[in-house]
C-alpha cells in the first residue's frame, strides 16, 4: 500500500466491560504499530475524519472506537459510564490488538486514555497522545458543555437546526457548509426529529 492511497476500513464489534459491545472502524497493517483513537464526549469515532484512513495508509494498524454509550456502541444497561467501566473497556480492546497500542484521545477520550495508561501494566500501552486535555477540569466549562447537550431533550427538527445550535454555542468557529460530520453525531427517530446519538445518562 502506498502513502496517499485510501485503505478500506472495516467495522468491528468488541466485547467490552460488563457485557457491553463497542464498535470501531479498523484498518491498516496488523504488522505495523497499533493505534487506538478515542473521541470526545458526545462525539463518535467519525470525529477523527480522514485521520483514520491517513494513518492506516501509512502502515499503522488503526482502531477508531466509539466509546460506550456513543455512536454505534451499545448503551450500558446499568447506565455505568464511569471511568472504571471505561478502563475495563479499554483493557478489553487492548487485548484484541496485535501489539501494544498508542492511545490517542481527545477531550473525554483523552481522560480515558490517560487513566487507562496509569492503571495498566507498563507493557500494555506503548505511548499516549492527548488532544484538548487539561490537568484540571474547569467546573464552569464542564457545566456549559453539559447544559448544551441537555438543552434539546426534544431533539432538532433538522440537521440544519442542530448546526445552528452548535454555531450559537461556538460562535468563534465558522458554521461548516458540509454537515456530514454533524450528521454522524445525530440519529433520526421515527418522529422525524434528530437527536444526539448517545446514551441519555451520559450527560
Label the predicted regions.
Residues 1-14, 25:
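An N-terminal hydrophobic leader/cap segment in hydrolases
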Residues 157-203:
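Conserved alpha/beta-hydrolase catalytic His-Asp/Glu region
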Amino acid at each position: 500500500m502506498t502513502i496517499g492511497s485510501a485503505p478500506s476500513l472495516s467495522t468491528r464489534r468488541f466485547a467490552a466491560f460488563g457485557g457491553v459491545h463497542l464498535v470501531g472502524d479498523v484498518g491498516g497493517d496488523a504488522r505495523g504499530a497499533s493505534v487506538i483513537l478515542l473521541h470526545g464526549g458526545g462525539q463518535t469515532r467519525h470525529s477523527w475524519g480522514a485521520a483514520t484512513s491517513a494513518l492506516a495508509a501509512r502502515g499503522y494498524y488503526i482502531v477508531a472506537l466509539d466509546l460506550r454509550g456513543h455512536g454505534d456502541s451499545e448503551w450500558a444497561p446499568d447506565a455505568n459510564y464511569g471511568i472504571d467501566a471505561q478502563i475495563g473497556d479499554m483493557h478489553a480492546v487492548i487485548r484484541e490488538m496485535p501489539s501494544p497500542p498508542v492511545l490517542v484521545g481527545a477531550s473525554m477520550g483523552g481522560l480515558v486514555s490517560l487513566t487507562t495508561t496509569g492503571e495498566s501494566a507498563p507493557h500494555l500501552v506503548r505511548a499516549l497522545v492527548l488532544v484538548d486535555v487539561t490537568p484540571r477540569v474547569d467546573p464552569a466549562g464542564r457545566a456549559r458543555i453539559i447544559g448544551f447537550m441537555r438543552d434539546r431533550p426534544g431533539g432538532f427538527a433538522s440537521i440544519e437546526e442542530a448546526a445552528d445550535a452548535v454555531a450559537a454555542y461556538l460562535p468563534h468557529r465558522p458554521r461548516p457548509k458540509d454537515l456530514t460530520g454533524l450528521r454522524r453525531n445525530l440519529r433520526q427517530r421515527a418522529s422525524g426529529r434528530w437527536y444526539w446519538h448517545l446514551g441519555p445518562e451520559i450527560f
